[in-house]
Each structure stands twice: as structure tokens, then as C-alpha cells.
């Protein structure tokens, strides 16, 4: 799947996903596209403080067509023992994993992740990167990771470097490395 934008791409101005020009979508079409096809992992977790881990993940699945199993998704991010806890009872890394589970549970076509390992130690970070990689392969999800961590870029099929808000380089990586080979 290609995602293209205008900044740094010369005269090209199109935003194309799955062969569809989403820059031509109406406001209603864009809302539906974001609701059903995109999962977001924000740098700030945006968890609902008076909902449990399970309820926070469940919240996202209420607006999608074919959600993944909530409990299995929470298990996959290593939080099955915290399923009944509230965000205030979780560490920053655990809250980040709830946010990742919430995005994955939507079963999106594309997952946009802003610093998904930012609050995680290296081992948990690698676990999450492996999960994202496996989900990408298993479910055909396009995963876009925005990060300052250069080591992670070696995992990507396509690496786009941004400098001063403009595309500086685009590199196709024919041999992405496994998460086990990454160290930071």
C-alpha cells in the first residue's frame, strides 16, 4: 500500500491509499475512513481514566466493523494480569501498551504509530515492535511508525526521513532486519 503526500515530492499532489485518492474524499468519507480503516497510537495515550484496561480497548472496538478479540489483544501486549486496572494504576509503559492494544483491536488496514516505544524499556519495546511486525504480516496491516529512534528504521520496508518538515529521503529496504537484531 502506498501513502503519498505533497511535501517534498515535487509537483505531485495526491494522497493515495489502496489505490484511492483520499484527498478527494468528502468530510463524511474521511471520517468513515479514519473510523474503519485507521488505527492510531498517539504519543500521549488518551486513555479514559475512569475505564479499565478492558473497557478502554473495548471502547475503540465499538466503532469498527470487524474488531479483534479484546482479551486476546490485551494478552498480546502483555497486560492480561492488568485487564481490570484503571490507567492511574498503570505505569507509563503499561498505559502505552493499552493504547497499542486499543488501536490493534480495531483491526485496521493501517496503523499510525507516533513513538510507540517511547515510554517502554528496550525489552518491552522489542516485544511491541515484534507484535506490530507480526500483526502487519498476519493481517496485512500497513504500519507507519513515526520515531526519532534511528535503530527502528532498519525494520522498515520503506524508510522516509523528514528534515525540517520536508521529505529528505525515501529508502526501500529490501532486507528489513528482525526486531531481535535491533539494539538501542
What are these model-predicted stretches?
Residues 6-7, 11-161:
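ABC family nucleotide-binding domain
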Amino acid at each position: 500500500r502506498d501513502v503519498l503526500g505533497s511535501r517534498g515530492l515535487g509537483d505531485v499532489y495526491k494522497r493515495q491509499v489502496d489505490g484511492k485518492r483520499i484527498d478527494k474524499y468528502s468530510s463524511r468519507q474521511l471520517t468513515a475512513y479514519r473510523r474503519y480503516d485507521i488505527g492510531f497510537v498517539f504519543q500521549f495515550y488518551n486513555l479514559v481514566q475512569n475505564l479499565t484496561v478492558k473497557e478502554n480497548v473495548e471502547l475503540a472496538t465499538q466503532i469498527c466493523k470487524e474488531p479483534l478479540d479484546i482479551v486476546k489483544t490485551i494478552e498480546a501486549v502483555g497486560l492480561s494480569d492488568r485487564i481490570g486496572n484503571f490507567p492511574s494504576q498503570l505505569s507509563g509503559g503499561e498505559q502505552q501498551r493499552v493504547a497499542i492494544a486499543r488501536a490493534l483491536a480495531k483491526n485496521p488496514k493501517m496503523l499510525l504509530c507516533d513513538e510507540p516505544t517511547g515510554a517502554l524499556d528496550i525489552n518491552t519495546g522489542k516485544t511491541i515492535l515484534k507484535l506490530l511486525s507480526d500483526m502487519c504480516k498476519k493481517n496485512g496491516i500497513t504500519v507507519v511508525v513515526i520515531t526519532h529512534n534511528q535503530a527502528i528504521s532498519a525494520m522498515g520496508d520503506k524508510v522516509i526521513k523528514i528534515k525540517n518538515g520536508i521529505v529528505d529521503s525515501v529508502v526501500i529496504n529490501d532486507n528489513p532486519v528482525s526486531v531481535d537484531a535491533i539494539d538501542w
